[in-house]
Regions:
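Canonical Rossmann dinucleotide-binding motif of NAD(H)/NADP(H)-dependent dehydrogenases/reductases
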Residues: 1-14
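A glycine-rich helix->loop->beta "capping" turn
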Residues: 32-36, 53-67, 72-79, 101, ...
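Catalytic loop of short-chain dehydrogenase/reductase
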Residues: 71, 76-109, 125-188, 200-201
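Short, flexible catalytic-loop segment of classical short-chain dehydrogenase/reductase
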Residues: 197-208, 212
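Catalytic Tyr-x(3-8)-Lys segment
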Residues: 212-239
């Protein structure tokens, strides 16, 4: 996302994250010198307030806020059936899931849902300031888009199966609905809220899924995945996500509000889902 926005020469990009080395790694992949790193823990209101003040000291407004933090936590899924198809005892299912510390479940919710929520709230004044800078409307002239929030969810939020974690799926279902509620809450303030729900993209979080499927590399070439798993037969690429973000951020995306945009190669079409 940062690379795509930088390549399209936005004026400033502030990136927030806990790890300084990760922030610097992101900057090293950009070319236009627009990226400003700020260390921040989105699970801390005090840290978010400090980050907001740091951004506000360097700009008068924010046109686009992307809440992109997320964690999967440890595996929290039912035990698999035996080779003969027989189910494991319910007591085994109960013990395996119940023995996971509640704090592990709460951490996933705290980062993916609570952290996103408070990140949006923290930066509302700068989003409002962006709208106040918009020029007066002119007849038959398309105005610049209003301020926007984009929250990253996941197709896991629509999945009825649990390939990895009850906590992760539940958190992304909550994130998806959070997008819709915030869109309604801010509609009359002129602040748009949209969500993106990626499928399988090569990333630190998804690498274990790729490995479990015997997938090597980024898996972006056709035929990398069976059609039964992903109809497009490949994982998502940087270009897929970059194009979506740039479109949403541009005038062409200015009429989009309250939407959840899937980018999954058709994965949700062939899996039990609530979409």
């Amino acid at each position: 996302m940062t690379k795509a926005l930088d390549a399209n020469k936005v004026s400033k990009i502030f990136i927030l994250g806990r790890r300084e080395n990760a922030l610097q790694e992101t900057i090293s992949q950009t070319i236009n010198g627009t990226v400003i790193p700020i260390q921040c823990d989105i699970t801390s209101k005090e840290s978010l307030e400090t980050a907001y003040n740091a951004v506000a000291a360097q700009t008068t407004h924010v046109d686009l806020l992307i809440a992109n933090s997320g964690v999967m936590g440890p595996p929290m899924k039912p035990p698999q059936p035996a080779e003969d198809g027989s189910l494991p005892p319910l007591s085994q299912l109960r013990d395996e899931l119940f023995n996971i510390p509640m704090e592990e479940f709460n951490t996933v919710m705290n980062v993916n849902v609570t952290g996103s929520y408070y990140t949006v709230l923290a930066f509302l004044p700068l989003l409002e300031a962006a709208n106040k800078r918009r020029p007066a409307p002119q007849e038959d002239v398309l105005a610049a888009p209003t301020a926007q929030v984009i929250i990253t969810s996941s197709i896991a939020g629509f999945s009825r199966k649990v390939p990895f974690s009850f906590a992760y799926n539940a958190s992304k279902a909550a994130t998806t609905h959070l997008v819709k509620m915030l869109s309604t809450a801010f509609a009359y303030y002129g602040i748009r809220v949209n969500g993106i729900s990626p499928g399988l993209y090569s990333s630190d979080m998804a690498d274990h899924i790729f490995r479990a499927s015997g997938i090597q590399g980024r898996a972006i070439s056709d035929g990398s995945f069976p059609k039964e798993m992903i109809p497009a037969t490949r994982g998502g690429s940087e270009e897929d996500l970059a194009g979506l973000i740039v479109w949403l951020a541009s005038n062409s995306g200015g009429y989009i509000n309250g939407n959840i945009l899937l980018t999954d190669g058709g994965r949700i079409s062939v899996a039990p889902a609530v979409y």
